[in-house]
């Protein structure tokens, strides 16, 4: 802390490209993307996650836009999930399932929209790796590599020296290798067969 009374914090890292930092306040985590020279101001009224504001860092502001919406949506799903523990009528259960499903897919659509619209930002990299409870993949398993590659190609122009770009490219290489291996295994299970026609000719 530079000044405990004023709640000012100084980070001595002078990285040219933004790095991810987490500020923990009142048990809640606020992710920030900060580069050398940034002078950031954080503010909040009431619930920290729902209401915090960011000034002085464009990447942190973009990250706030994604993070607040994503976390709020995930909390909404969690609240609806607890409702299933209550004794519900068939009609109430069907209604809750419909509401839960609609919210789930809304969050997923907004996540993908953010990634595509802000593909040249490091906030998009953060969004790529966020998952709702129970989810393994971003969207649909092997097809996820399309989104990773889209962001990586954009970052080559905006942040070519970022270590997050290198990590992203390594992840894409692993995904490509897995897809290739899966394809080879599938082909091995279904060998080409040469069959004769009704006249006994191939």
Language model: regions and residue ranges:
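Single conserved hydrophobic/aromatic residue that forms the stacking wall/gate
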Residues: 1-7, 11
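Oxidative protein folding and maturation machinery
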Residues: 12-201
